[in-house]
Swiss-Prot record:
Composition bias, Low complexity: 76-86, 195-207
Localization in the cell: Nucleus
Keyword tags: Nucleus
GO cellular component, one term: nucleus
Listed Pfam families: EAR, NLS_NINJA_AFP, TDBD
Ranges of Gly residues composition bias in the record: 12-23
Organism taxonomic ancestry: Eukaryota, Viridiplantae, Streptophyta, Embryophyta, Tracheophyta
Region of interest: Disordered: 1-50, 66-207
Organism (species): Zea mays
Family, similarity comment: Belongs to the Ninja family.
Protein name per Swiss-Prot or TrEMBL: Ninja-family protein 6
Ranges annotated as biased composition (Polar residues): 131-173
Length: 288
């Protein structure tokens, strides 16, 4: 292309035109800035239209708007961004009124429930008093029949029934009124079961108590005084448990005081003796 223009300018021929026609399609001035000006390639040519500036900020105006209308535009009102709708005063008052109504309704229900529970507790009290009167009548009738059978058997059964009667009453108090009213005639059958349980518990309790007594007698044996004289008397006590290096102490049964062997003999009326341990007798354990 350059060789063709060169031949057209410097070559001879009919098609060759004036030198001014060759640069008609080229720009008037050569581009020497290489696009490094503020406006880029288009900043050097004032005749060419400028590019409109695009901005994401609404308050910044573009170049075209500045040329069109120099007066500043009115600022737009900022919209409230929220995930919940704005609550008016009427809605707030309505919501508070509904909450107060719910509280009053819950309080009324609690009062009604409390009153109903009080009335129910009064009714079982009357039923319990009726059951106790029936139980007393049944025990009186049973005692009359046992008196006709024999006096000795009555005494033994009365001693055995005394703990079972209280257990039976406690069990009847814990039963609901419907079950107690349905079975008023089975008093004898209900009395036998607590009696068996009571005897078993008494047996285990007696066994454990006897074991405790044996251990206590082994650790602290019973002693008594053996004194001669006009003011002599027998004083019982038990040897208090002591460790090695401690003084021997005897607990007097009549007063519960801790005494030394000499004081124990003097308390029995023996006076001052040279060897008080000879006047103290250790009693054998009754459970051995």
């Amino acid at each position: 292309m350059a060789s063709r223009d060169f031949l057209r300018v410097f070559g001879a021929g009919e098609g060759a035109g004036p030198p001014g026609d060759a640069g008609a399609g080229q720009p008037d001035d050569d581009e020497l800035s290489l696009g490094l000006s503020l406006g880029g390639r288009f900043g050097t040519d004032a005749k060419r239209p400028r590019l409109a500036r695009s901005s994401s900020i609404a308050s910044v105006c573009s170049v075209s708007s500045l040329h069109a209308d120099p007066s500043p535009a009115a600022p737009l009102p900022l919209l409230r961004t929220t995930s919940l709708p704005t609550e008016t005063e009427e809605e707030r008052w309505r919501r508070r009124e509904m909450q107060s109504r719910r509280r009053l309704e819950a309080r009324r229900k609690r009062v009604e429930r409390r009153n109903s529970m009080g009335s129910v507790s009064v009714a079982p009290a009357d039923a319990v008093s009726g059951r106790r009167s029936n139980a007393s009548q049944g025990s009186n009738s049973a005692s009359t029949t046992e008196q006709g059978i024999g006096g000795s058997m009555f005494n033994q059964s009365a001693d055995a029934k005394s703990p079972s009667t209280s257990d039976n009453r406690n069990q009847n108090d814990m039963l609901p009124p419907t079950k107690a009213a349905e079975k008023p005639l089975n008093g004898t059958a209900t009395e036998q079961q607590p009696r068996l349980r009571t005897l078993g518990s008494l047996t285990t309790r007696t066994g454990s108590t006897s074991d405790i007594r044996k251990l206590m007698m082994e650790d602290m044996p019973m002693v008594s005084s053996k004194v001669e004289g006009p003011n002599a008397r027998r004083i019982d006590g038990f040897l208090y448990r002591y460790k090695k290096g401690e003084d021997v102490r005897i607990v007097c049964v009549c007063h519960g005081s801790f005494l030394t062997p000499a004081e124990f003999v003097k308390h029995a009326g023996g006076g001052d003796v040279p060897n008080p341990l000879r006047h103290i007798v250790v009693n054998p354990a009754p459970f051995s």
